[in-house]
Amino acid sequence: MKESFYIEGMTCTACSSGIERSLGRKSFVKKIEVSLLNKSANIEFNENETNLDEIFKLIEKLGYSPKKTLAEEKKEFFSPNVKLALAVIFTLFVVYLSMGAMLSPSLLPESLLAINNHSNFLNACLQLIGALIVMHLGRDFYIQGFKALWHRQPNMSSLIAIGTSAALISSLWQLYLVYTNHYTDQWSYGHYYFESVCVILMFVMVGKRIENVSKDKALDAMQALMKNAPKTALKMQNNQQIEVLVDSIVVGDILKVLPGSAIAVDGEIIEGEGELDESMLSGEALPVYKKVGDKVFSGTLNSHTSFLMKATQNNKNSTLSQIIEMIHNAQSSKAEISRLADKVSSVFVPSVIAIAILAFVVWLIIAPKPDFWWNFGIALEVFVSVLVISCPCALGLATPMSILVANQKASSLGLFFKDAKSLEKARLVNTIVFDKTGTLTNGKPVVKSVHSKIELLELLSLAGSIEKSSEHVIAKGIVEYAKERNAPLKEMSEVKVKTGFGISAKTDYQGIKEIIKVGNSEFFNPINTLEIKENGILVFVGRAISEKEDELLGVFVLEDLPKKGVKEHIAQIKNLGINTFLLSGDNRENVKKCALELGIDGYISNAKPQDKLNKIKELKEQGQIVMMVGDGLNDAPSLAMNDVAVVMAKGSDVSVQAADIVSFNNDIKSVYSAIKLSQATIKNIKENLFWAFCYNSVFIPLACGVLYKANIMLSPAIAGLAMSLSSVSVVLNSQRLRNFKIKDH
């Protein structure tokens, strides 16, 4: 069983990887992925051995709060921005108090500056009050940090909580010594770290605020889509408008769509017309004109006039629901490149705590001053600096932040990745296999000519009547041609479809019930064919005389022109060093002509579904990383076989199960865009990881004091600033993907 839920209380990648590690050890858990950024988890488990409630209890034991739905954040007295502003104000107050004697002129009264027991104590008490206020503003670090430590799952908050608490306790001890006159000399006099506590917390709060703002912006794509989802719709019942919940709509319901309202579910216009904003599907801002017979898709907005539509999908299976599911899965899943960071994060925090303790002991022994409290002060500064400067957040944010921003960028291009692995793998593709009809071509073959051995209207009636039972694009072209010429469409029975060949049905022909067949030449038993010299898609119409013999009645010649700009986009793809193939069920002449015209390297014609599978299998056995690009209707087996499957979809044509990448703008440029975006994203992730590893590799030793003899020591305050800047730099670097642009050359 697969389930998705939310987890509150996570602060860094050590939290998410700790949950994965803990639950992953359970025999009944098959797979689990936890996303820090959108606080979600996807889990697959054996429902015969456990249930979701038991899994929730396991997570709660680790100190986190699992929930089936993400509750709204509790409204606090102070907003995040106000809390941050107060933290900055009180930090500056404490820092000024601690440095008052060094400032000239000082705004502090003389009574707080004199070097004596009373003034030092009074100054320190004011610093303590300011520090306690800042600690209260940043109390979440202590609540989450110590809770995680208690459950033996230490995280970034644990490091901050331990470091600042140690500094506070030491300062309180020093305050006690000053108050009771137990200090021995000037080295132990007034060694307070209240300003360090404040500065550390302030910098971390600033960094976290920047992270959260950036994360919220990256999550805007999904939030915007969810806002497009209407909760109710107007259902027509007995000529009356009734407002109903969208979840109650079933296929076949007649709905009224008013100007300015969103389409509730996928459907087809049956009365009226409208202009729809389909930018959430295609990325194109211009409204699309819709008339009777046109499809409309959930989440799109009606700009002008009202119309009636018939629902063709329920809410769960509508286009908008599938897009939201894809985005959620993409944001919740993990790329393979993130596994290294997860492994490091699992041991990072415990290792940092061990290093900090070791550094404290070493400095307590080797500190150069003879006074214990001086040595203790140096050792404590090193201890706090090591804890605070280490940044598991930079490692944890390196991959998911880039994936999050990349998915937002993809949606603006009309692209949707099924998961992070799809986004990661697209850049590795070296062979692309294209379907022809509906992918490279317009997908709407039109009849060029008809060659008939019987009365033309009778042939059109037979072919149109049978083909109306099919959803194939060629069938639609024939049906439309028959309707335009007012051919009467008959009732069919015993309709049978042979995938890749054609369709047959029993109908009235010359007063007798006959089996009429429509399809390619291989669908028929040997018959006398007409000599057709035209290039195009040949569709034969025949009558079954017996099980082994068919009579030819006529031939339709159709053509399907390439989409505008396809040739240029194929050239772009080939410039990336990618081999291209065309697999089509069309005849050799048409497929060859299309391949040569578009500059495609190789082709296979008359390809049945099994032929396509065999070719893809052959390419993969040669070591090729294969991407299949199809329309998602008749290519599901081939799409499933590929390393990366791209579906060129229009609304409800999308098959989420078959696709790794879905393009709603129905443009081959999307393939090039997906590959380039994948390349840019992985490059961005590698930059983030390089910075995160280098930062921790360099700054942790510096915080330990390895350059002490060169007079380089990092104070806890500077360590806090460096830690905040490291995670912020990763976030800001990820944001550069927002400016990603597809070059046309």
Swiss-Prot record:
It is found in: Cell membrane. PROSITE patterns: ATPASE_E1_E2, HMA_1, HMA_2. The chain crosses the membrane at residues 84-104, 125-144, 152-172, 195-215, 344-366, 380-397, 686-705, 717-735. It is a multi-pass membrane protein. GO terms for biological process: copper ion homeostasis. Cu cation binds at C12, C15. Mg(2+) binds at D631, D635. This is Copper-transporting ATPase. It comes from Helicobacter pylori. The gene is copA.
